[in-house]
């Protein structure tokens, strides 16, 4: 497994690979890898010739310096996991490599209709940072296919639109959310939970599933469903932030033409901000 931190070497390596292989997969990450990441990497390993994993804690997508500083960094452990699974290369650039000048003066990419709604309300510059770094990685690696987890659903929808808008010849493949046995979506930020909070955390998924059950049973009043879910989460000790039901393709409010919707939850539990989602096909009358 190659460990590459230099753009020139990355490009030279990919140029050599392109002479003899058909497909290159990219899996962008911020490190602190868990079983959810490994599931995504395995998908790439099973379906492409070359798998490149990027590990970069991107300062442009953090709104608070404290969060950037505290984000878990476990490079050696990450390398061991990726080597064991058969990854071909890990790209681990420094901030100076990816943003040669002052980051505040750097060119950025924005997807305005998606970056300012839902998560974007609470994290104003987050998706600008995501779109910019993913675009840079696309340009550097020039992959045939890129894998993203469905847990960060708004990010997935945004990247798909960015690919369409910027005419990238790249296939985006979504990998279903990986969960612990009790239903909690795996996340690097779960490490912020205390042992007691970790016992409570699965309630987020349970409350969401109750809402989904009622929705599929024909409940039409979405406000009633969301208000009930918010009260349940508050009762368990969460501070709800986003409780929404949106069109799964556009993330806009659902209409009679929406074929599939997505239930989106985010809530604070102590110092951990937990997010989750479930896609639902609405039964037609």
Swiss-Prot record:
Major localisation: cytoplasm
InterPro entries documented for this protein: Pantoate_ligase (IPR003721), Pantoate_ligase_C (IPR042176), Rossmann-like_a/b/a_fold (IPR014729)
Residues where beta-alanine binds: 61
Pfam families: Pantoate_ligase
Active-site residues, record numbering mapped to chain: 37 (proton donor)
Documented EC number(s): 6.3.2.1
Listed GO CC annotations: cytosol
SUPFAM superfamilies: Nucleotidylyl transferase
GO BP: pantothenate biosynthetic process
Binding locations of ATP: 30-37, 149-152, 178, 186-189
UniProt superkingdom: Bacteria
Alphabetic keyword roster: ATP-binding, Cytoplasm, Ligase, Nucleotide-binding, Pantothenate biosynthesis
GO molecular function, one term: pantoate-beta-alanine ligase activity
Annotated compartments: Cytoplasm
Catalytic activity entry: (R)-pantoate + beta-alanine + ATP = (R)-pantothenate + AMP + diphosphate + H(+)
Top EC group: ligase
Biological pathway: Cofactor biosynthesis; (R)-pantothenate biosynthesis; (R)-pantothenate from (R)-pantoate and beta-alanine: step 1/1
Binding-site residues for (R)-pantoate, renumbered to this chain: 61, 155
PANTHER family in alphabetical order: CYTIDYLATE KINASE/PANTOATE-BETA-ALANINE LIGASE, PANTOATE--BETA-ALANINE LIGASE
Assembly notes: Homodimer.
Additional remarks: The reaction proceeds by a bi uni uni bi ping pong mechanism.
Function description: Catalyzes the condensation of pantoate with beta-alanine in an ATP-dependent reaction via a pantoyl-adenylate intermediate.
Similarity comment: family membership: Belongs to the pantothenate synthetase family.
Descriptive protein name: Pantothenate synthetase
Naturally occurring in which organism (per UniProt): Baumannia cicadellinicola subsp. Homalodisca coagulata
Native organism taxonomy: Bacteria, Pseudomonadati, Pseudomonadota, Gammaproteobacteria, Candidatus Palibaumannia
């Amino acid at each position: 497994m190659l460990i590459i931190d230099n753009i020139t070497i990355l490009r030279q390596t990919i140029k050599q690979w392109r002479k003899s292989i058909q497909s290159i997969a990219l899996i962008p990450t911020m490190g602190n890898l868990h079983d959810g990441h490994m599931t995504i990497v395995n998908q790439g390993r099973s379906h492409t010739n070359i798998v490149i994993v990027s590990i970069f804690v991107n300062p442009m997508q953090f709104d608070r310096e404290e969060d950037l500083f505290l984000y878990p960094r476990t490079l050696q452990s990450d390398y061991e996991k990726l080597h064991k699974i058969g990854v071909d290369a890990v790209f681990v650039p420094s901030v100076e490599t990816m943003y040669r000048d002052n980051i505040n003066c750097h060119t950025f990419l924005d997807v305005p209709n998606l970056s300012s709604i839902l998560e974007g309300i609470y994290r104003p510059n987050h998706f600008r940072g995501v779109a910019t770094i993913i675009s840079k990685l696309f340009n550097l690696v020039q992959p045939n296919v890129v894998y993203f987890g469905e847990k960060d659903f708004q990010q997935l929808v945004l990247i798909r639109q960015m690919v369409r808008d910027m005419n990238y010849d790249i296939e985006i493949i979504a990998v279903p959310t990986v969960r612990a046995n009790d239903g909690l979506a795996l996340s690097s930020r779960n490490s912020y939970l205390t042992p007691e909070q970790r016992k409570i955390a699965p309630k987020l998924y349970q409350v969401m599933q109750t809402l989904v059950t009622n929705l599929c049973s024909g409940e039409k009043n979405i406000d009633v469903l969301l208000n009930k879910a918010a009260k349940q989460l508050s009762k368990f000790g969460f501070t709800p932030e986003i409780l929404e039901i949106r069109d799964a393709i556009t993330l806009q409010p659902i209409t009679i033409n929406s074929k599939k919707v997505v239930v989106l939850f985010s809530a604070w539990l102590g110092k951990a901000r937990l997010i989750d989602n479930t896609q639902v096909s609405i039964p037609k009358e």
